Swiss-Prot record:
<keyword id="KW-0414">Isoprene biosynthesis</keyword>
<dbReference type="InterPro" id="IPR018294">
    <property type="entry name" value="ISPD_synthase_CS"/>
</dbReference>
<feature type="site" description="Transition state stabilizer">
    <location>
        <position position="13"/>
    </location>
</feature>
<dbReference type="InterPro" id="IPR029044">
    <property type="entry name" value="Nucleotide-diphossugar_trans"/>
</dbReference>
<dbReference type="GO" id="GO:0019288">
    <property type="term" value="P:isopentenyl diphosphate biosynthetic process, methylerythritol 4-phosphate pathway"/>
</dbReference>
<dbReference type="GO" id="GO:0050518">
    <property type="term" value="F:2-C-methyl-D-erythritol 4-phosphate cytidylyltransferase activity"/>
</dbReference>
<feature type="site" description="Positions MEP for the nucleophilic attack">
    <location>
        <position position="206"/>
    </location>
</feature>
<dbReference type="InterPro" id="IPR001228">
    <property type="entry name" value="IspD"/>
</dbReference>
<comment type="pathway">
    <text>Isoprenoid biosynthesis; isopentenyl diphosphate biosynthesis via DXP pathway; isopentenyl diphosphate from 1-deoxy-D-xylulose 5-phosphate: step 2/6.</text>
</comment>
<keyword id="KW-0808">Transferase</keyword>
<comment type="similarity">
    <text>Belongs to the IspD/TarI cytidylyltransferase family. IspD subfamily.</text>
</comment>
<dbReference type="InterPro" id="IPR034683">
    <property type="entry name" value="IspD/TarI"/>
</dbReference>
<comment type="function">
    <text>Catalyzes the formation of 4-diphosphocytidyl-2-C-methyl-D-erythritol from CTP and 2-C-methyl-D-erythritol 4-phosphate (MEP).</text>
</comment>
<feature type="site" description="Transition state stabilizer">
    <location>
        <position position="20"/>
    </location>
</feature>
<protein>
    <recommendedName>
        <fullName>2-C-methyl-D-erythritol 4-phosphate cytidylyltransferase</fullName>
        <ecNumber>2.7.7.60</ecNumber>
    </recommendedName>
</protein>
<feature type="site" description="Positions MEP for the nucleophilic attack">
    <location>
        <position position="150"/>
    </location>
</feature>
<keyword id="KW-0548">Nucleotidyltransferase</keyword>
Length: 223
């Protein structure tokens, strides 16, 4: 299985002053732990990191253990552009791909394998968790307009897996139509293509705040 890891986190909300994937987490960089989990998945055979050129040296230095096993890919101005660059940098024999956020360092390798296996039967799959909070839809002035049934609500995570041919087609359509999305599954939705949900777990958080970092430290103490 081929895996692409967008790794251009600005670290603004972390107040880090650098790419948040370089933040120290139990003696290693955040991206180190992500790669450790990804390479622990037995079905993974190729990994590409998509980042900004000015981060390349520092990011690769922080994951020297994996330096011979990863490919560097220059990213674009947005996550969407970066993933498209990644798709165009895959080996010619790549038929399926998993896209995984660099900041989700607590991903369980078994869930990575599960996503890969589900692509045997589906064109697109994503990890997600059932929403447990009551969700409110509000207007621009902050007034509640609707309370959707949470039984039908899931919080999207990564990995998100796709047939390479279909995902590339979706990205090309997005360029043509000027669609802007925050995850790749949204492109399939806009094209009315099916995406299969795979239930993930609540520990697969995306590190976006100092609190998230403290939570990750607690999980990694026994890793």
């Amino acid at each position: 299985m081929h895996v692409l890891i967008p790794a251009a986190g600005s670290g603004r909300r972390m107040e880090a002053g650098k790419n948040k994937l370089l933040i120290d987490l139990e003696g290693e960089s955040l991206i180190y732990w992500t790669l450790k989990s990804v390479f622990s998945a037995s079905l993974v055979s190729w990994v590409g990191i998509i980042g900004q050129p000015n981060d390349k040296k520092k990011l690769l230095n922080s994951v020297k253990k994996f330096s011979n096993e990863i490919e560097w890919i220059n990213g674009g101005n947005t996550r969407q552009e970066s993933v498209f660059n990644g798709l165009n940098s895959l080996p010619s024999n790549a038929e399926k791909v998993l896209i995984h956020d660099g900041a989700r360092c607590l991903i369980n390798p078994d869930l990575i394998n599960k996503c890969a296996l589900e692509l045997e039967e589906n064109d697109a799959v994503i990890l997600a968790t059932k929403v447990t909070d009551t969700i409110k839809i509000v207007d621009n002035e902050g007034y509640i307009q609707q309370t959707p049934n949470r039984q039908n609500l899931w919080a999207a995570q990564t990995p998100q897996g796709f047939l390479v041919k279909k995902l590339r087609e979706a990205h090309e359509m997005a360029i043509e139509k000027n669609w802007k999305v925050t995850d790749d599954a949204s492109l399939f939705e806009m094209l009315n293509w099916q995406v299969r949900i795979i239930e993930g777990n609540s520990s697969n958080i995306k590190i976006t705040s100092p609190l998230d970092l403290q939570i990750a430290k607690l999980f990694l103490k026994d890793y």
